[in-house]
Amino acid sequence: MRYANRIACCVSLLFFCLLVGPATQSPVCAQTAAAAQVPAVQPVAPANISVRASENAIDESVASDPSVEAVIAPYSAKVKELNAPIGRLVGGLKKGGMGGGSLGNFVADALRSRAEVVLKKPVLLAVINSSGLRKNQIAEGDISSSDIYELLPFENALVTLELSGEQLRRFLNLTVEHRNAQSGARIVYRTNKELKKSELVNVKLRDAGGAEIEIDPAATYTIVTIDYLVKRGGDYSVLQEGKNLRPLSLTMRDAVLEYVKAETAAGRPIKAMLDGRFRYDRTAQAQESEEEQP
């Protein structure tokens, strides 16, 4: 639209200059007239093109080209490997709701489990952004590497860092606000009608023995998350306030793949469910599970 207006303006100026004549041209008219002296584009006759087509069916009777087969062979092998079953999924997984649903629980649990293997000690909490889960569901049955690649297409890496109890509560409030997935906490939240967003009401962690513990604002807690959230800044700048940031040299995708393979090797099927790690607070009413949240 900008260029159309500019052309219309130039044409109007040129027409005005032609009317008033060369003797009375203003500098603008003279410039416009000079600019208008552009060689005209000569029309070109359309070329005559003759096309001849024939149908040639290609089926099993046509031998494969060895040179083409040699090029695609490595890729075919990789695709076959990606589609091969690496575990058995019970119940299926679905994304949605607070915490990314059962799919979010599955990924967060997997990251926490593999982080414990790398660190060789219990991990209190793992948090990831549910928006990074790019597959809405995985059906019950065989689960393959390609399912995990589709679910986690990004190269987000696991990191561990230390937060004070006060910083951790702020981070978990963001976790609720953004409906992110987590493993290790029991969270109660509510809707702030004035701000039109979810907010943290109460949270408890589990110690190495499985007992629930309150967050001490003055204590230090080691958590696992992903580099994307640490680098993001903005609301997540609380993570940049943490200490002893350490990369685990493991991507989210590889962590989940390793988790599935390890569970399968141990004879355990892959499963995750809505287990009440997020509970909605209805004020005077009893707290309800995430299946019943609005």
Q: Model features per residue range: what roles?
A:
Residues 62-90:
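N-terminal, Lys/Arg- and Ser/Thr-rich interaction peptides
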